[in-house]
Design a protein with these regions (language model features):
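ADP-ribose/NAD+-binding catalytic cleft of ART/PARP-like enzymes
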Residues: 1-49, 63-64
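Short active-site loop/helix that positions an aromatic residue
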Residues: 55-69
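Active-site and NAD+-binding cores of ADP-ribose-processing enzymes
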Residues: 23, 30-31, 66-141
């Protein structure tokens, strides 16, 4: 039986597997590259591509990114060096418990998770409210 539960914060999806949540229509083999518009701030070009090792963080990306329809979660492979995402590292929690990363190098799409479960409507509404209170440019690009 497959466990159909909400994602658990800080729980690594599978060791060595990286995820990217978005509403973009991507295919296996495509590259995610820096230099595209932010999913969270209209008109802002991003210098990095972001990804995570946790299903929870990828789910937030899929649910909160710009665009219509249901989000998607892709399995990605970093094509170069990457670092802890400074937007979340050592902020609310010590270290990088969300296992969130960024890179100036491309990420290759190697698969897609198709049967993931999203956050509850209440959690989603609370997160959207928190993001609306952030000042433009508060997230490093």
């Amino acid at each position: 039986m497959i466990d159909k539960r909400e994602p658990v914060p800080f729980e690594v999806y599978e060791p060595g597997v990286y995820l990217h949540g978005t509403k973009a229509d991507l295919a296996v083999g495509e590259m995610l590259v820096p230099g595209r518009e932010s999913n969270f701030e209209a008109g802002r070009v991003m210098n990095y591509v972001y990804f995570t090792a946790t299903l929870d963080a990828a789910t937030w990306g899929a649910e909160l990114s710009a665009g219509e329809g249901r989000g998607r979660i892709f399995v990605v492979e970093p094509m170069g060096e990457f670092e802890d995402d400074p937007n979340v590292t050592n902020k609310k929690f010590a270290g990088n418990p969300t296992q969130s990363f960024r890179s100036r190098e491309p990420l290759r799409v190697v698969g897609e998770l198709v049967d993931w479960v999203g956050h509850s409507p209440e959690k989603l509404q609370a997160m959207r409210g928190g993001l609306q209170r952030k000042e433009p440019g508060q997230i490093e690009d």
